Amino acid sequence: MLEKAIELIDQLERNGFECFIVGGYPRDQLLGIETSDIDLCTNATPEDMGKLFVVKKEHFGSMIVEYQECNFEITTYRKEGAYQDHRRPDMVQFVTSLKEDLKRRDFVMNTLALDKNGTYIDLLGARNDIEHKLIRTVGDPYTRIKEDSLRILRAIRFQVVLGFKMDETLKKAILEQKKSILFLSKKRIYEELHKMFSKNPEEALQCLKDYEIDQVIDVNEFLNKGLTPDAIVFLGKK
């Protein structure tokens, strides 16, 4: 998958564009965690991409691109407008700067980028947060959570799965805005809970209590949909 991603990046560069690996992959590489989940971002617009590759799906500059029998999620550099539904922006504006694109992302640790040669590009302090195992938002946490309520559960999941600690201001923002997760679909809530409980059920349950999420939703309603055997055994003891 990585080799094909590098070839895709190389093809974009040969056509005058830039493209980087972003999101969880650079972070996990720095942590020594194996992952095959590769997301890309580029200054090429969806129109540009359509001239070079098979674009199977596109919305607001986020594309599913088929390349050598692999599907890649590729996003055009963008700024986002207001969020009315606590989940997605009402509009986006394409930009030409990687740094401008990274500013819209959720947590600083997820703003690390990687070029095709394996060189890290750190424009917002991601390496420092990763090295100190810190979860903090890009910008004001109250604003970032108000934009997208899923960030509450994502922050808790990263604490559980990666063993990172939460920034104190982010902790307060989560506790004060915890009820906003009710704006999320049950499907998205289940997906996040499943990821954290599958990794570390005891820590997941404790974190959900610490952040008072169990006061907002019936955690068991979601967990009964299916978990790993270890998680089911653990919950059965509660």
Residue ranges, per PLM feature:
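Catalytic cores of the polymerase beta-like nucleotidyltransferase superfamily
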Residues: M1-K238
